Amino acid sequence: MNEPGSTFGAGEAPEERLRALLQHVGHFLPAQGPIGVFVHHNTLHAFQHLPFHDALAAASALFEAEPYLSEAEFRAHIASGRIDDQDIEAALAERFAETPDERRGPLSRIEIERLALRFPIETATQAGLGWRIAETGATRELRPDLPSGPYHRLLVYTERWLAERPHAAARLLDQGGRDPESRAALALWDACRGVPLPPTEPAEPPLVDRVGVDRSHRDLLLAITGEDPAELIDPPFIRLLGAYLDEGVAHWAMPDRAQGLFRAFRGLVLEGSRPAGAHFAGLDAELRAIGANMPPAAVAVAALRDLGVAEQRWEGYVTRVLLELPGWAGMVHRFEHTPSDRPAGAPPASLLEYLAVRLTLARYALRDVARRRLGYRGPLAGLVEHARRAARPVEPPPRSPDGDRPFRLFQLAQLAGLSVAQIQPLSAADRVWALEVLEGLDEMARRRLLHEAYEHHHRVEVLHGIAANLRRPEDERAVRSPRFQVALCIDDRCEGLRRHFEELSPRHETLGIAGFFGVPIRYRGLDDAGHASLCPVNVAPAHEIVERPREEGAALVRKARRRRWARFVHALGHGTRTLSRGVLLTPTLGLFSTIPLVGRTLFPRAYARLRRAFERRLLPAVPTQLHSPHEEGTAQGRGGAAFTASEKAARVAATLEIMGLTRRFAPLVVMLGHGSISVNNPHQSAYDCGACGGRHGGPNARLFAAMANDREVRAQLRERGIDIPDGTFFLGGMNNTTTEEIVLYDDHLAPASHRGEIAALKDALGEARKRHAHERCRRFASAPARLSPEQALAHVEARAVDLSEARPELGHATNAVCVIGRRELTRGLFLDRRVFLVSYDPTQDPSGAILERVLLSAGPVGAGINLEYYFSRVDNLRYGAGTKLPHNLASLLGVMDGALSDLRTGLPKQMIEIHEPVRMLTVVETSTETAAAICARQPALRELIHNGWIQLACLDPATGQIARFTRGAFAPFTPPERPLPEVARSLDWYAGKSGFVPPAIIRATPSRPSLEIADHAA
């Protein structure tokens, strides 16, 4: 935000300045679109121009949100070994890299900070400390968490000191010091409080001075009276927004929506629909006086002036008002600037009109609370000054000069192993210096350093694993003569499926690429009502593809049945909501609905199978094919042009070149898209393919395979140096990441010579998906402890159709790494389904041009997913959506808690519970010079990398050396000397473990049947 004294467009009218201000302030609002097309993004996109930790501090102040895990969580990680001493030392080394250490007396700055990170050093009020001393003997015993070294030093040195001072020993005996520990504690406490110390001073300005800076009148009244004025206006305001923005829930549309939010609101009030409550008395008269033609901007400006907010403070005040309901305000802002998110005929969206309505209602609520709770009946412009006079000063909790700071010194001395003999001689200046160092490392600074240590531990584990894997013979990691090649999305959930598929045979090869496979399209499936863009959200598809039946006769019968069934279901649903038919239908349908309800609740998997069988009977599946409405040429239609042969060849070539698959083709090459299907899950789109705009990637895979099989395309590819053998056939497919179902498309088009291999491929994929389901089940708390792969597969299938299941799958939870390079870097390495695997061959890209394209797509996409999970994990109430349990779908836009709340943006608790919030470690197989040159050319990448939103490491393809980007330069990484564990298969490493599992070498042996796998199940 700008400084409070700043203005926008100083020479313009106030209304125009307010418009310009809203353009700026709108960036602080959530950018999440409608929940049906959920696309992951950096929650703090407005702060991305700042270094990571600075951005977190700024956002924490603005949103009142947590930037890191809590200190208690970090200390639990220290206790479990997730953060060790080496990690803390590494974090401190980074902190003091450019600042020399300082020592005063027996302690240095780095020693004090090390102790503050390892152990909690508490503060206490005077009353609290007195109670602890009297009731718990806090100063008569040493800390229970004191390590043995400092503990024994304190006892030994204190006894020596007392031996030379009999009078001191006698005094301690009178105080209760009858054993070495109590004598050491009492003597140390006397020494710590022996020199008077000045108390710390609070620095935060009074709340009344912050109105218009980072607080509003609502905050002021809430703090003074305990009553929140927003509770009076939120219910009618949320109902108004829900009705105005509704995209299909309401049976009757709100009137006058086409005129804009403010005029529609005014019309409702003047027609007698004024918000309920005596506090809104006079609202209809005010709106009538405003007139129908008064611009909303003028209404908002008048409201701000009525509130007494000076223009130089508009920005801070308006920001605070918009952040009262950030979800709704953010949705309005997104619709205003991204109208393509909305269906045709949707009403106009304007953040300015939102503000005008909000301020209009807010003034009535503020007057009411001020009158009832403060007895103030004057103009709102004088409310702040009245509050200044009326409110008692809020004093900080009393702190004792004789207790609080000496008590912290008492704790610090214990942890450092400093006895009375070393503390007593310290001057007041030395004591204050030590305490100021301790106080300077406040809670936020400690959490920042502990977070760095937390990330360091993970970073070393991953880079050590990759370095150890590279030391294996290349023949163990490379596939010389592939039988099957399967290209999957770079999605971290695909890492496990790829690993299990490769463990089945050394001739199984997998690759990774963005799941739209380089073919952005507008797609309409056979049963779809409209088109959907299957491509990244920043790409506008120029081509339209539709799914059509191969036989029109059967398709027409199916279509007619589907329409009749839809009309019947709609009539029943609508009828239950009407007075006349509802009386008859509701009891009857209610009785019969108990049968499917019991089935879906108690036997979800069996019920789902029965329902699918019924649907197949009612609506038989028909064979289909992909078709462009303009295949005869490039004439533009409603959906864009057809793909020409040269465009097809260019798309296929680009995708194959990015993956490094330009030679050594297998007889069968599969492009496997992915998506997720589950029930009772408003966030289902968040589980789908982000590269396809939050939708399924199967159509893209199917289209790419058809292009790659085209003879004319292959002829043009040969001219480009990509010679696909005649014996190679491409297949498209779809992987349901919830159920592990894998469907291959158009296998009937394969030559007869490939039918046997296709059957073998299906068997291998079937075995891999069972093993992958088994690995996934170890992270589900509700999954039985001992499952065979077949049972595990049945379990994940049941989760997808269970109405009560809040976690059908875990999505991208646990994502932490992106590896861009050849599969040889990670083949045979257990990476715990935490890695985005992007195929790239540096030997085929001497200029780095291909890598630049890969980084521009994978970098921001991976960072967006990673950072959304990060922020939803560290503060699920502010940055996330909270628990799913009270969620209700609102206007087909998002979810609310219960019937009336803000739109909950971010990810729900059930998607992030097991996530480790670490920034993405991006490992790129390239030289540091190439990476630096790309960053210099690409501002978007430079912002992410130089500001630390992602962590970059380069693996030199010539030397195998790893270098990490830190503090603006690359520094060599030296892996630990300890060997990496080695096992025969993934199951042997993860069996019996439900948490995160570090990397290990998988020396795959010939495939064994699933029955034998079951014998080793955890």
From Swiss-Prot:
InterPro entries: DabA (IPR018752). It is found in: Cell inner membrane. Its main location: membrane. Keywords: Cell inner membrane, Cell membrane, Membrane, Metal-binding, Transport, Zinc. Its cofactor is Zn(2+). The keyword Protease does not apply. The keyword Cell membrane applies. One of its GO terms (molecular function) is zinc ion binding. GO terms for cellular component: plasma membrane. It is a peripheral membrane protein. Zn(2+) binds at residues 489, 491, 674, 689. HAMAP family: DabA. Forms a complex with DabB. Part of an energy-coupled inorganic carbon pump. Belongs to the inorganic carbon transporter (TC 9.A.2) DabA family. This is Probable inorganic carbon transporter subunit DabA 2. It comes from Sorangium cellulosum (strain So ce56) (Polyangium cellulosum (strain So ce56)).
